[in-house]
Amino acid sequence: MTTYDRNRNAITTGSRVMVSGTGHTGKILSIDTEGLTAEQIRRGKTVVVEGCEEKLAPLDLIRLGMN
């Protein structure tokens, strides 16, 4: 599933991202999309990033690189 970060860059599983509030970087391990609309996915805490204990909203992420 593709969703979009805070700058409207496409992010998917495997994308390298930075958490805007903390500066933590990592790869997206999964995006929970089951039964959700695109808007709910983008605004809800649906993304698991390696090294982060809690799920994050795509709007809290910034894509790093072009992957």
Swiss-Prot record:
<dbReference type="GO" id="GO:0005829">
    <property type="term" value="C:cytosol"/>
</dbReference>
<feature type="modified residue" description="S-selanylcysteine">
    <location>
        <position position="52"/>
    </location>
</feature>
<dbReference type="Pfam" id="PF14001">
    <property type="entry name" value="YdfZ"/>
</dbReference>
<protein>
    <recommendedName>
        <fullName>Putative selenoprotein YdfZ</fullName>
    </recommendedName>
</protein>
<keyword id="KW-0711">Selenium</keyword>
<dbReference type="InterPro" id="IPR017704">
    <property type="entry name" value="Se-bd_putative_YdfZ"/>
</dbReference>
